[in-house]
Amino acid sequence: MGRRVSGKVGLLVGATLALASGCATQPKLPARSEVLRGVLPSAVQLLSERAGGGGHRAASGVVVASDPVRRLTWILTAGHFVAAPAPETIYVRTTGTRDRYRATLVRADRDPDLALVLVENLVLPPVKSREVAHLGDDVWVIAFPRGRQMTLASGTVSQVGLGKDADPTEGPVQQIDTSVSYGASGAGVFDAETGELIGVVEGYRTAQIATRDAPDRVMEIPVPGETIVISAQAVRRFLSRSDLGAFLPR
């Protein structure tokens, strides 16, 4: 799922120093393959079906909270995915399976463009998040483009917002240079070193292309490397209004 606006944003969630022998060393980070295996179960696909079989739409999502006792899982996705004019049924499909679980809409906002859905009788691991990103950080986007199989795309943080220390190189992530397409809205943006969630895909910029033979017919294509992200900071504020504090990962 992804909104596109030509030429504009297409709308679519500390290292500790150790001193040894007079030298400062950083703790060893886990291998990226291990990090990836840890975050994959938290990435899901969302599907919506219109009543009466009038078509379907797709988006991506990320698990932000769970309750193992009551077997409940809360999933974050893009707000515009659930903003359909006609009633729709929402389903969640987990990574690596064809199983579908019916979901209930809990909350949706336009600013930020986020939605929270609840799935019963399913327990998935929630992600941990980090609100500060750094320019050049390696990131992963785990999405289900065009409603198909899971895709892992890599890139870097290319734009951050103003942080509390006014450091131009760090702050809430705003843009990454990872290329995404329709169906990636709501996908988690993860730090590739730690697996922490630093944001959620909102959309991508598009360009209009017309052919000489049919100038009235315009195609909109994603602009490579201009993916807009809702920061983990904005995700935290959104979740704080959803009464999930007891179920969020510490």
Task: Describe each region flagged by the PLM.
Residues M1-L11:
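Bacterial N-terminal signal peptides that target proteins for export
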Residues G10-A20:
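Bacterial N-terminal signal peptides
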Residues L29-R32, A43, L47-I75, Y101-R102, ...:
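A conserved glycine-rich beta-strand in the N-terminal activation segment of trypsin-fold
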Residues E34-V35, V62-S66, T104-V106, L118-Q149:
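Active-site substrate-binding loop(s) of clan PA
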Residues L40-L47, A59, L118-P126, T151-F238:
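Active-site region of chymotrypsin-like
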Residues L46-S48, P87-G96, D137-F144:
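Short conserved beta-strand and strand-loop elements enriched in small hydrophobics
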Residues S66-D111, N121, R212-A214:
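Catalytic-histidine neighborhood of serine endopeptidases
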